[in-house]
């Protein structure tokens, strides 16, 4: 279960990408009201990272070697033991290609709506 949930931490649609998306885009936003909203949302996404991290920690803190292997968590465990590392469930490490910051208000806001599943 933790191997799947960790994708919400550092996967392509995870909280790390979301927080960086909003916090990066705020600097080129021409409207101060929107800058504040992007800052607030980015900060909220950081809080989501903390919650996901707590869930992964609770799921992994007392695993036995047998459980680690049986659950498929062994490939993660080899490199990180039970430390939190941002990656997708596939094992791909977090990369900044997961989010965009183009410097154009319409483009950035459209990307935000698409990333959050909002109807565009």
What are these regions (language model features)?
Residues 1-120:
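Non-heme di-metal
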């Amino acid at each position: 279960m933790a191997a799947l949930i960790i994708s919400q931490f550092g996967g392509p649609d995870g909280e790390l990408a979301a927080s960086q998306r909003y916090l990066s885009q705020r600097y080129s936003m021409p409207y101060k009201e929107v800058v504040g909203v992007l800052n607030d949302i980015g900060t909220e996404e950081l809080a989501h990272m903390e919650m996901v991290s707590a869930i992964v920690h609770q799921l992994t803190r007392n695993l036995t070697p047998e459980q680690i292997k049986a659950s498929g968590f062994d490939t993660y465990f080899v490199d990180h033991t039970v430390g939190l590392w941002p990656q997708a469930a596939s094992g791909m490490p977090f990369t900044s290609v997961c989010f965009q910051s183009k410097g154009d208000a319409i483009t950035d806001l459209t990307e935000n709506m698409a990333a959050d599943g909002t109807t565009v």
